[in-house]
Amino acid sequence: MRQLCLRHLLKVHGDKSPGYPLNLDYTNNHAAMESEFVGILNSCIARLHMWLTIDETILAEEIDSYWLLENGYMDPSTIFIKDEPHPERKLVDGKYRCITPVSLVDQVVEACLFSEMSTANKESLFASGSAVGIGFHPDGVRDYINYVKSMEKKYGPATEDDVSGFDSLHTPQVYEASAEYDRLIFRIKGVAENWWKAHRVWSKLKPYSIVVIGDVLYVRTDEGMMDSGSRDTSRRNTTFRRLYGFYIAVLMDIVQNFDVLPNGDDANSWGIPENHLETYRKTAASIGITLRDLRYANDGKINFCSHLYDFNRTDGAVLTSWPKAVYKMLTKKVLEPYDVRQVLEEMRCNTQYPVLSQFVQKVAPLVD
């Protein structure tokens, strides 16, 4: 257990926030580990042991968020507005994109519990019904387009959508369903029953974690808030989106000829009958899912994960969220040549690339 925690502790992103309470004294994970490495490692080991030996009978009782905190099962999550350009509509509505990072110790514990499933997801890309780990390089683009075409032959035209406010929709029931889904899908060799038990209990208790703002603790009164900063956030969000997609298909009685490929809150679906998009949207709304930009792919092009794919072009995809990519690059505390090259590579297929390239290299002259 010590070696497992050590391995994942050494993998955390050094420039990310260590979360509460370490963020009271340290600006990032690197600074915290440099000063308190042994103590942090021991805390990770102790907490992982608690999850692996937890008594499932506590699930029959009413969950008390403070009990979880006081008994050391998890730390409070912090919350802040994500540092990125926001659409004007979000500013008008006051609906900013919030991030709720988990503590450094919880990052490591969750990585210990779930990293093998995340790895299995990426190694079985598409086959597992997930696009987590999809590459936007030519090989990844080619694989994705071929997958979309094969699914269209099987189920009919593809649709594209994303879910508004997806991170706030995850009820305890959805967490529980995702745990059972994982148990059925991921039959990872050597995973003992106590790991699955820890997974089940974590899935039941995670929705009751506490949020800290400043020095005040808040209990979540609205069900469904996905924390970020976990090694499992992307995979779990993707699982939730897949479960929601199939539930909508069941309600519409189209599940026998339906499939969905999600990556977080973005998804492509197949099997929605012609002229039934509005029914699909309304059915989703009836279970609290607001679908944005729901439409059929057309003209041989399809949107997915902020990229526009052209079926007749497999050398890359057009990055539609390039302002965010440039902003993220410009706000890095330490800007490396790799960061600039990565942004330029992402924007390579955009029609505005010559102008964007000149701008990027002017403000960040690190690339020949």
Can you describe what each PLM-predicted range is?
Residues 1-368:
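Viral RNA-dependent RNA polymerase
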